[in-house]
Amino acid sequence: MSQTNGNMEHSKETPQSQEVEQLTNGNHPEEQQEEEENNGGLFQISVKLPHEPHKIQVMVSSQEQVQDVRQSIVELPGTFQYTCFHLEFNGKRINDFVELSEVEDLKADSEIVLVEDPYTEKEARMHTVRIRDLVGAAGDRVDNLQGLDAGLSLHDSVTAEAAASEEKEHSLSKYDITASPSLKTILPRDEAPLPKTVKSISLSAWNPPPYHLRQKGHLLYLQVATNEGEQFQVTSHVSGFYVNKCSNAKFDPSPRTIPKKVSAHSLLTLISKISPSFNTAFEALQESNNQKDLLTTFPFQNAIPNSPWLVPPPSSNVNVHQADITRSQESYLISGVDNAETLRDWNEEFQTTRELPRETVQDRVFRERLTSKLFADYNEAAARGAVLVARGEVAPLNPTEDRDAQIFVYNNIFYSFGADGVGTFASEGGDEAARVAVGKDVLGIKAVNQLDINGLFTPGTVVVDYLGKRIVGQSIVPGIFKQREPGEHQIDYGGVEGKDVVATHPDFVSVFEKMSKALRIKKHAVWDKDSKRHDLEGSVETKGLLGTDGRKYVLDLYRVTPLDVMWQEEPNSEEYPHRMSVLRLELVEAYWRSKMSQYVKAEVERRRAVKAEAEKEKPAESSESKEQDSEEKTEEKTEESSDQERVDISGFQLALNPDVCSGQVPQTDEEKQQWAEDEKEVRDACDFLRSKVMPELVQDLHDGDVGFPMDGQSLGQLLHKRGINIRYLGKLAQLSKEKGARLDALTTLLIQEMIARAFKHIANRFMRNVPAPFVASCVAHLLNCLLGADVNANPRAEIDASLREFYPEGDFTFETVTPETLRAEIEQQVALRYRFTLESEWFASLRHLQLLRDIAIKLGLQLGAREYAFTKDQLPPKVPVVNGANNAAQDEGKKKKKKGADKSPSRAIVEEKPAVSIVPDDIVNVVPLVKDASPRSSLAEEALEAGRISLMQNQKQLGQELILESLSLHEQIYGILHPEVAKLYHQLSMLYYQTDEKEAAVELARKAVIVTERTLGVDSADTILAYLNLSLFEHASGNTKTALVYIKHAMDLWKIIYGPNHPDSITTMNNAAVMLQHLKQYADSRKWFEASLSVCESLFGKQSINTATILFQLAQALALDQDSKGAVGKMRDAYNIFLSQLGPDDRNTKEAETWLEQLTQNAVSIAKHAKDIQARRLRRINMNPRVTTLGTKVQPQVGQTAPEASGAKNAANASLDSRSIDELLKFIEGGDTSSSRSKQKKRAAASNPKLRGSKKSSA
């Protein structure tokens, strides 16, 4: 490839890093060019190459390491073939791990030389893997961690539809808002196969080389089959690759000289020499890859991709399993013969990373980047091991113990089951308590990791739910298995065996004190079995261990918050499955903030009282001069105001005792009194949750002040954000019911979530002991009992009897489950776990598809896509078959026959199975669900917060610089594909939209869509919001038809995850209607306003202000659609509502009144001049009416307040209409008006941060 191509591609890839590095690497004053280059600015260097194109230019930063430059070279299209090389400057080799600033004399326009290195066996294997990926010869990988289509994005196929719609009518022209959901919406589209460059590249049957040839530098033997049908045997040698004389029957790895000797340092170059068609095919492959957005194919590095719950069935063309001999060889190619290359000492890596310096910004960036990558690698490795443990593939260290008590070590990770195998939690609820405890432990460790306390260490921890089992994977803490001397405790701080023995150690006090202060934990006394007092900084359950490496480890962090005392003391609370019901950290934080604001208020009041008292006592006369007096007054005023602003909060302290009500017995009166005070504080916190937090959330949702949850996941996130535990679903459902029809949507969602979670607990109990080959049968049968009882009231589990004989000890009790018993058990579980009573016929009103989706996500199921039948009328019609001849349908024409019986001629002899909703074959796969303890980047968050504050203070330039720096930090630390980065893209796109930089907003919103799809799921609530925002920004940029395609896709997703009539869909329908008006599609626009009105009336009632606002818009839409009579009627309705709700003096009432008068006059004149109107209608073609009625609105995120979504400025200025009435009336009457808005000069969109990973920047 030409040099220019290489340069161009690279310059495309790096503008983001250019902008960013300048910001990250010091906000230096603008000094001389040279000094800036040396201080971390960007500069260009050239790289001299041994082959074509012989030289390339690369943009670098002095803060980059040499290995980053290497990576840039490896990824450029002109230099793909190099993997084994080093760089030289001035004839000296440069170390890969030094920063460029440390390379002597290196400056702008310097030339470094790429020198090819001899291969080692590992380098040769890596080179082979890379070239296979590069030329598209690698087949599909079967992965036990990532399921089918993991990391799928539909953005490109939706965008392709948008591009097509630009040429024809808009995408909502025939859209049916009330139609049932189509599952095709969330499936990958069929794509044309990629150009094939070679038939295969694999290891040869002669591999590995024998000893005597290894001595001569032979590393591997490969076999390459070209598109021309020839097969070549290739030797991988230390010097490169060459074609050898081997055949399938004869071994001779010496170079082949006939017709000529073919060798090259890179396998890519060698293939291009032996296959004439390779170069053309390879260029075509690159071209077709470049048509996709780079982000959609970018490999995951710091996150586990999302595995969709619905995938194409095995029979479809999308996931065809193809022959690939190298698939089974890949683990050898990647990790060597003995797999030792991938073994890592996880614990040592975690702790040494924690000990890295964090003084400078560069130190922190390097440390957090390493931390993020390490956690991602560990989470993936631990999850893979957990899957093997669950499947019984790993031998236990203690095989004689009971199954639940067995422990395992695999890949240097220690595994145990999240069950009470040794009776630790016997008094707390056994297995149920243990299961909850390990989940809470991960949350506790995550919180401590986030605090990043110097000198306090946590083990790497992951919890994996798979096939009904919960497995904990931890890095091995040095000394945890060490047998201590007699009299020594296994634990150095906290409760040793339960709470009977308590250990204390002076070394732990200072670090535990820092942790407890940050987590609002109170230092308190506990007593051992001998009633001896010990003062602990944390809960007695939280343990400190002094590792043999000298580090202080904190373990068992499941009790960093107090028990929810009120929950445990409710009537019938002893039936609750466990006693591990603790408060959430978010609630403790909210309670602390609430108490603090009370303290500040009281302090201000106290000061005012003191001041007022002092002023009363002042003598009336004053001896000072007037001048002095006035000076003092002004001084006093400023002091007074600053006094009110600044309240010293060091006097405020609030910390909760986590061991309250958990069996501690204080001894002295003083201790009892202290304990009673601690208990009161905890009770107040519990009361705060019940009397303030929960009612406030319900009220906010009732008033439409926050974004409405769409499914179980977004509901859970919303509750957790507010500090509400999932166990309060029942209480919330009661509160929601009391609010009446307005919150029906919330009540339905809460009840659906309780049913889904109850089913999950039941299914997990059965799956835990079912042999792996029968899991699909078990789940399918349970789902049929829950969702398919209408199709088949008595479903039978489908089990292969011959296979069953191999598992005499397997638990097959799931066969006995019937729809009736399952319903009874779900009712019992809901009553037990959520203290809510389901109505007697609850199963009759299930939303089948939505419930199926929620259950699939909770159990990690991947279902094959088809039109599932949950009711009898959804079943496909039966075609009577008699002896293979279709007698019944003879009069229905040939086409029908073809579709019906002729497809399967063997039907006559096959015994027909009873219809069921779900068969075992529908469950294509089960993926593990991973809970990790990865901390977020504090540095990136600090930069974002600083940028936000600067923008709020109107320091636009500084604010944008800080925000771009935060973006750079997010991408450097997390990599591009990460939920945190998706969130940031979303927030930044909003900020750019609000500052009127539309191009940048669209670019970032597009990235937000792709990264959200790939990390959170193609049909997650966040994905819907990302698409809706993208549609808004596209419309603002003038691409309204494209915007409507995105709205259509979002509406289709909404139907799948929630169903019709979601409260937030009112805003979306309004936005669609406004966009259609912009396209002058007045009839369609009117339909969407009417749909929006019907949802609004059903939710808020006919007399609400929301309804009046939509009536106001609908009246305008009717006027634009030439229905003046209808317009008058709707405007009158709007006016009457505003009048009764807001009074005659309100601005909205007055505006509606004015409109009503004008529309009424207009209607009269229209009736008089019917003929004129006919003529004027013909002139509509020349019209240029104003764009919007109410204008499009930003969609609030789930749990986000409306002003937050639209930006405070916009929220304040929102009024019914910004247009002059005359303009619209002129248009209705047929006058030729031109938009005043079009006359305004549009603000030039500010510079677009072209970020890495955009389509434009694809390499």
From Swiss-Prot:
TPR repeats lie at residues 982-1015, 1024-1057, 1066-1099. GO terms for cellular component: cytoplasm. Residues 1-38, 612-647, 881-908, 1192-1215, 1229-1259 are annotated as: Disordered. One of its GO terms (molecular function) is mRNA binding. It is found in: Cytoplasm. One of its GO terms (biological process) is mitochondrion organization. It comes from the Eukaryota. Residues 1-27 have a biased composition (Polar residues). Its main location: cytoplasm. Disulfide bonds: none annotated. Keywords: Cytoplasm, Repeat, TPR repeat. Residues 612-628, 634-647 have a biased composition (Basic and acidic residues). Residues 324-568 form the Clu domain. May associate with the eukaryotic translation initiation factor 3 (eIF-3) complex. Belongs to the CLU family. mRNA-binding protein involved in proper cytoplasmic distribution of mitochondria. PANTHER family: CLUSTERED MITOCHONDRIA PROTEIN HOMOLOG, EUKARYOTIC TRANSLATION INITIATION FACTOR 3 SUBUNIT EIF-3. This is Clustered mitochondria protein homolog. The lineage of its organism: Eukaryota, Fungi, Dikarya, Ascomycota, Pezizomycotina.
